[in-house]
């Protein structure tokens, strides 16, 4: 993953849930910069906690390389936050070199005192990210049948849970 160049276009940052402005969502988040050499000898990273408004950052491959495949990426972080760069954006850029889109999910982490929903927040966010990618497949030049999910550590648990708790949403609705 070292020495990867950015894709042709800047990544698109979207709120996972409608009615939220992606540019104002980070006001309550805590970002810890992790120096180069701590997790990876060549790359710095960031650990984001207190995520209240999840986002998905869409890294599309160069048009000439695009295969139509996409992967929703769930960074790890022990459900205390997300290692957004090393286990998120760096992986998305690597997927771009293979012709696949990388969609980095910055998901909410459980706060039992606040979460009264039937499904845990991270799972809701992952299911929504997959539905959104499928709903916007034509716009992003993706094949909706070639959208997968992967994760690292807690994000791996989240990815496997999302894969076994499939949620089609409302495919005929304007908002998936």
Segments the model singles out, each with a brief description of its role:
Residues 82-84, 90-91, 105-144:
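Catalytic nucleophile-loop/oxyanion-hole region of alpha/beta-hydrolase
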Residues 55, 59-65, 83-89, 96, ...:
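Non-catalytic cap/lid and distal C-terminal segments of serine-dependent acyl enzymes
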Residues 124, 128-176:
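Primarily recognizes the serine-hydrolase "nucleophile elbow" in alpha/beta-hydrolase
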Residues 70, 96-108, 148:
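A fold-wide structural signal in alpha/beta-hydrolase
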Residues 1-44:
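N-terminal targeting or regulatory segments adjacent to alpha/beta-hydrolase or S9 domains
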Residues 20, 75-80, 153:
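Active-site glycine-rich loops that stabilize anionic/oxyanionic intermediates
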Residues 17-19, 46, 56-67, 138-140:
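Short beta-strand-to-loop junctions in surface cap/lid or active-site-entrance loops
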Residues 67-76:
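Short beta-strand element of the alpha/beta-hydrolase
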């Amino acid at each position: 993953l070292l020495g990867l160049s950015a894709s042709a276009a800047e990544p698109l940052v979207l709120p996972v849930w409608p009615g939220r402005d992606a540019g104002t969502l980070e006001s309550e988040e805590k970002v810890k910069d992790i120096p180069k050499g701590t997790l990876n000898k060549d790359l710095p990273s960031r650990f984001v906690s207190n995520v209240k408004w999840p986002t998905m950052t869409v890294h599309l491959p160069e048009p000439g390389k695009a295969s139509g495949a996409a992967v929703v990426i769930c960074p790890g972080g022990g459900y205390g936050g997300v290692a957004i760069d090393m286990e998120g954006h760096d992986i998305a850029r690597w997927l771009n070199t293979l012709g696949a889109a990388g969609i980095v999910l910055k998901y909410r982490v459980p706060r039992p005192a606040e979460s009264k929903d039937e499904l845990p927040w991270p799972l809701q966010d992952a299911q929504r990210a997959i539905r959104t990618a499928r709903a916007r497949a034509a716009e992003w030049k993706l094949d909706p049948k070639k959208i997968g999910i992967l994760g690292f550590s807690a994000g791996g648990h989240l990815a496997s849970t999302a894969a076994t708790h499939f949620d089609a949403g409302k495919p005929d609705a304007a908002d998936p």
